[in-house]
Amino acid sequence: MGQNDIMSTAEDFADQFLRVTKQYLPHVARLCLISTFLEDGIRMWFQWSEQRDYIDGTWNCGYFLASIFVFINLFGQLSGCILVLSRNFVQYACFGLFGIIALQTIAYSILWDLKFLMRNLALGGGLLLLLAESRSEGKSMFAGVPTMRESSPKQYMQLGGRVLLVLMFMTLLHFDMNFFYILQNIVGTALIILVAIGFKTKLAALTLVIWLFGINIYFNAFWTIPAYKPMHDFLKYDFFQTMSVIGGLLLVVALGPGGVSMDEKKKEW
């Protein structure tokens, strides 16, 4: 079987998967995407005093302001998740969750930690794709009305979302002289480039979903660590943040790469 035959078979599989799952794949994608906000909002409720004390100790802002910070995180994340899942005011929910990401990036000094910053940016990329999807749904009620100019922001949002999503994979690269890691880096880098430029996008994104899900289950198995150990919370944070990026990639699989992509340009050629 030649290289073209393998690619053709893989693309047929991706198309078949999309046909079978197209009814519920966007719902699964949204649930995965907001999972990190849902988990963090619930954690804020159960760890209210610990989070308040941490913010107060870090910024020396007093109990009142620290409590306001925890409340904003709790309410903002849970309400945003409810709106996204119920598909009501999704654009406002996305802007609110963007604000939560920015707030946490500053409050928890993520700005100075390149790995966590890249993961937060990847999470923002997922929200950007969700925002593009909500714009698409809003336009669908005007089917038949020319919207070429109005669709441009959506296309660039999809491009920005794809590019930001690949930052997640930059944090997974290993620079050890190990055959498995070298192979993983080569294959992973090729796939993220394909997603970023929008070439064979659905197949590349679906492959990344499978790969990332496997890595997530293996390396971030927080359920194997007792809840009282700090590593439990650390792995849980990593697990759900990775699930959110998986949700963003599933949106790419479900909706396609958008107008600013090699796949779309090929249709014009």
Swiss-Prot record:
Q: Can you name this protein?
A: Surfeit locus protein 4
Short motif (Di-lysine motif): ranges:
266-269
* Membrane association type: Multi-pass membrane protein
Sorted keywords for this record are: Endoplasmic reticulum, Golgi apparatus, Membrane, Protein transport, Transmembrane, Transmembrane helix, Transport
User: Could you tell me where this protein is found in the cell?
Assistant: Endoplasmic reticulum membrane; Endoplasmic reticulum-Golgi intermediate compartment membrane; Golgi apparatus membrane
Q: What is the lineage of its organism?
A: Eukaryota, Metazoa, Chordata, Craniata, Vertebrata
Q: What is the organism of origin for this protein?
A: Gallus gallus
Q: Where are the transmembrane segments?
A: 64-84, 92-112, 157-177, 179-199, 203-223, 242-262
Q: In its keyword annotation, does this UniProt entry include Membrane?
A: yes
Record InterPro entries: Surf1/Surf4, Surf4
Q: Which family does it belong to?
A: Belongs to the SURF4 family.
Q: Name one GO biological process term.
A: lipoprotein transport
